[in-house]
Structures are given as structure tokens and as C-alpha cells.
UniProtKB/Swiss-Prot annotation:
Transmembrane segments: 649-669, 682-702
Coiled coil (UniProt feature): 333-368, 514-633
GO cellular component: endomembrane system; endoplasmic reticulum; endoplasmic reticulum membrane
Biased composition (Gly residues): 491-500
The organism's place on the tree of life at top rank: Eukaryota
Lineage of origin: Eukaryota, Metazoa, Chordata, Craniata, Vertebrata
Keyword check for Nucleotide-binding: no
Sequence positions bearing Omega-N-methylarginine: 163
Membrane-topology descriptor: Multi-pass membrane protein
Described purpose of this protein according to its UniProt entry: May be involved in the regulation of the proteolytic processing of the amyloid precursor protein (APP) possibly also implicating APOE.
Name of protein: Transmembrane and coiled-coil domains protein 2
Biased composition (Basic and acidic residues): 115-131
Keywords carried by this UniProt record: Coiled coil, Endoplasmic reticulum, Membrane, Methylation, Phosphoprotein, Transmembrane, Transmembrane helix
Species in which this protein is naturally found: Homo sapiens (Human)
Amino acid sequence: MKRCRSDELQQQQGEEDGAGLEDAASHLPGADLRPGETTGANSAGGPTSDAGAAAAPNPGPRSKPPDLKKIQQLSEGSMFGHGLKHLFHSRRRSREREHQTSQDSQQHQQQQGMSDHDSPDEKERSPEMHRVSYAMSLHDLPARPTAFNRVLQQIRSRPSIKRGASLHSSSGGGSSGSSSRRTKSSSLEPQRGSPHLLRKAPQDSSLAAILHQHQCRPRSSSTTDTALLLADGSNVYLLAEEAEGIGDKVDKGDLVALSLPAGHGDTDGPISLDVPDGAPDPQRTKAAIDHLHQKILKITEQIKIEQEARDDNVAEYLKLANNADKQQVSRIKQVFEKKNQKSAQTIAQLHKKLEHYRRRLKEIEQNGPSRQPKDVLRDMQQGLKDVGANVRAGISGFGGGVVEGVKGSLSGLSQATHTAVVSKPREFASLIRNKFGSADNIAHLKDPLEDGPPEEAARALSGSATLVSSPKYGSDDECSSASASSAGAGSNSGAGPGGALGSPKSNALYGAPGNLDALLEELREIKEGQSHLEDSMEDLKTQLQRDYTYMTQCLQEERYRYERLEEQLNDLTELHQNEMTNLKQELASMEEKVAYQSYERARDIQEAVESCLTRVTKLELQQQQQQVVQLEGVENANARALLGKFINVILALMAVLLVFVSTIANFITPLMKTRLRITSTTLLVLVLFLLWKHWDSLTYLLEHVLLPS
């Protein structure tokens, strides 16, 4: 396992950052505590603090400690502790002002009929409704893991902690020290095998560490792990983070391991949480639910539209397929399959979105709206300057070598802190403030190694080493480095009033006889936390084994599917080869058939040609015979001439006869033109007929009548 990155900070950066440290010291802020907290601090340990301020002069130069790394850890813990104080104090005051104006803004919105997420006040105090760089709207937030929801539910269900049982409560003489309530450490999962991997001691077994697999960007040369060991007495607050990895995790809502401290703060009353997790804003929840309902309705309408479009495509395909030929049907089918596949993919995506929105709606109805970064920490640069000033003031009692070591570690620490914290959402800051009560409490952490007896300091240091000792370290050097970090976290200089080194309050705390029992109790809690971590590791191993089994099963199924596909491919190949063989055989048989048919056709054509030649020969013979007959008919030409002349004579006679007939007809025709002529002609003919018939009688009569005389 790798060592902490803070142990690897070298002294060669000291000269580089010396000027920056001196500039940061010039911005040392004054007393920035609220009146309630100042009163509580004075009421809890007023006599002790006054006595310590009077009895503790400004310490002179001390001898150089034997281990420079331990002193560097002390200075780093003091620096970042006071920086967190000034960082979260201003944020807490702004949250209080926002909380005071929330009721008036809500009433004003109800009177005007404005929606809950459209009002500027609600946009200012509800980070979920902002459009920030992490998610464009509330409904584009990534769904939090169910394990993290369980942790938040358990945190919300815990009772409020009174400040009366603070760690700083002590007697006036310092001999009768009371055992304080121990706080749990809240930590984020360090990246890439940090030595502070989930080293925390929760009291509640249900708040065990939740290991979450998360892929983050690889470390660059400029990003360093920042290990913050904030210790009050024998309590260890471990905040191990990686600048880019943790920023990505917090942006995505992947807060890995959170635990609520049992009690921390001054003796002036209960810890004041700005916005309790258990009581979300009902109007904001209602607005989120309404917005999700609108999105669900919109997605449902889109699904209906896509389904109707797909049905129309099917109907159009059937209509076109009935009126097309085979080639057009194949083309139409390809186009339809593409359209159908695209619409199916669109419908599947819409269904996924619908299920996602329904899960988020159910989650919001159960746990309230999920948090989102409201504002970037605007005063982070000033806080970092205050950190440098506080480090300079806190380590003023040490030798020049200590200052050089702190200067060397300040550059990398401030760079990593600025990179990590500025990119974090506001939820991370509020969670840290809820865990530690108020960030101002860090200023009350004193250094037991400054003014106490050497044996008490050694005992406190050994107790801290006992607290952080764990089999997770690979060597004694790493363990000693972590021990120095744990002990140094309690040596916060405190830049506020009364924040001088070597406070008698801390000496009384660490010199009390009851601290041994408290240390044993803390060690017991750490062992319990380690057991919880081991259980979580076992659960993770079980999950990994389950995933491995599932992947193995999937691989076996894919292998079986691959074998089946290979068998099908082999069968298809054999079938293809058989079909090719059959085609070759059919081609050979067809060739034989074509050759036979062509031979038969040629033979038929030959026979037809021979028959034609025979007919031509017969015609030639007939023509020759006719020519012979014609030659024989020339001899009878005279007889034929006589016959012709006789026929001509007969024709001439017939012509003469016809002339006579025509002449007679010409005489008769005028007599037959009218009815009168026809009648007279008929009578004349009858008379002539009668005369011809009685001609003998008429002649006899004429002879006897006319010729009697």
C-alpha cells in the first residue's frame, strides 16, 4: 500500500513558496466567531482559557523536534483546520440569512401564483433548481445509489446532539477531567491505495463504510492526495481526498462513505444544522415531483407518437408490398426494416427514460429532492490566504527548520486544496459542516506538545499513534507518519482571539487521568469500525464474486452460442457445398440434353432438306414432260387453224342474225312506248293474226263478192 502523499512533500518547495507564505500572513483575519459560539466557549472553559492566556507567555524558540515529518504533519493539520473554519463560517452565515428570508419569499410566491422553481429566492436557496455545470436541471441529475440513500436516511433519523457534552468541557484545576463524547470520523474514500483507506471508527454499525467502485481520471503530476487529520484530543477526523477524483465523485453524487459524529462543538447548546436532511423543503419537493410528472407525460406522448408512426409504417409497407413485384418488395422490405429498427430503438430509449424518471420520482417521494451544487465557493482564494496566514501564526513557536518544512508543504497542499474544493458542489461543504458541527470548533483544537509536560506530550503522541495504528500500513515509517499526522491534527494554532499555542485547556484535556479510558474507548470504536470495514469488504468481495459468476455464466452462454453458431455455419457450408455439387450435376445433365436435342434437330433439318430436293427434282421432270408435249402439238397446227376459221364463220353468222333481230326490235320499239300504242299495236297484231288465220275464207269471199260480175 502506498504512503500518504502528504508524507512525500519535500522541503525543496519551501524557498519557492516562502514569499507566498509571508503574503498570506499579512491577511490574517481577526475574530470571526458568532456571539453565541464565543459565549459558549467562554462559559465552558472560561477560567481555564483565562488562566491559560495569563500563564502562557509567547513561547521562545524551542529545540528542533527529532522527526521533521511529524512537525510537518502538525503544521498541515493546523493550516487546513483553520482554513476550513474560515471557509465554512461565511457559508454558514449566508445560509442562515437565506433561511431567515425563506418564509417571506414563500408567502410572496404563493400570493403571486408563481411556481416554486421560477422564483429568484427559491433559485438562490435551492441549489437543485439551478442550471450549473454538473447537471442542466433538477431532472437531469444522476440517480444516487441506493446504498447512499440508506446512509442519508440513517443520518436523518439520528437525534440532535447537545453541545453540553463537548470535548472541551474541563474543570478549573484541570485535575478532574471528564470523559467526552467521542465523535465519529467522516471520510471520503481515498483513491488509488492511500494509506488512509477508510480508517474511521463509527459508533453505529448501520453507518458502515460503503465501498463504491468509481472510475476517475488518472492522476497527473500536478494533482496530489490531500490527507487532513483533524484531531481533538484523541479523536481523529480523517478527510482523505484526491483533487480530481473526489471532485468527479462529488459532482456525480457518489459520496462514498459518510458517518455522523456523536457530538462536537462548544458547550453553548445543541449543534445548529442549517438545512436538516430529514426535513426537505415541501414546495421544492412538490415542484420537483410536478416537473417529473410533466416529463413522464411528455415521454409517454412521445412513445405513443413513435408507436403510431411505427404502425403507419407497417400499414404503408403492407399496402406497398401488395402492389409491387418481387424486386420492389425486397427493396421496400429493406427500407421498412431500417425504419422499424430505428423506431424500435427510439421507443426503447424513451422507455428507458420513462423508467429512469419513474425511479427518480419514487426516490424523491421517499427521500426528498436530491441536492445539487448551488454556488461555487466564492471565497475559496481568501480562505487559502487565511490558511497561509494561520499556518504562519500557528508555527511561529517552532524553529526555522519547521517553517521551511511547512513552506515546502504549503505549495502542493494549497494547489491540491484549491483544485479539489473549488470544483466541489455546495452539498459537500454542508455535509462537512453537519459532521463537525461548526467549522469554528476547529479553532479550539490546541497543541498538547507545546506547553504541557514532556511526559504528557509523549503520552498524547503515543495515544494518537495507538489510534491510527492499523495493519493497513506496510511499514513502521508509514505508521509513524500517520501517527504524526493524527497528533498534529490536534495542534491547530487557532487564529481567533485566544488562539495562542499551548493553551492550558488542551493541557488539561490531554493531562487528565480519564484520557486513558477515553483512548481505550476510541481504540475500541476504531476496532469496531475496522470490523465494519471488513464486513463491507466481505460484502464487496461477495458482490465481485457474484459479478464474476454472472460474467462467467454470460461468457459460457456466449461460448455456447458461439459453438451453436459455428455448428450452424458448418451445416450451412456443407449444405452450400452439396448444392454446388448438385448444380454441377444438373449442368452436366442439361449439357447432355442440349447436345442430344441439337443432334435430333439437325437430323430433322437434314431430312427436310432432302425432301425439298426430291420435290424440286419432280418439278423439273414435269416441266420437261410439258416441253415434250408442246413439241408434239406443233404437228397438229393446221387442224387447229381450220378449226379456228370455222369458229370465226359461225361467229359471223351469229352477228348477222343479231343484226336482223335488232332491226326488228327497232321497228317494234316505237309502237310499244305508250299504253295507247301498245293497245293499238296489239289490236293490229290480232287483226293481222285473224286475217292470216281466215285468209282462205277472205279470199273466197272476195272472189265471190267482188268478182261476181
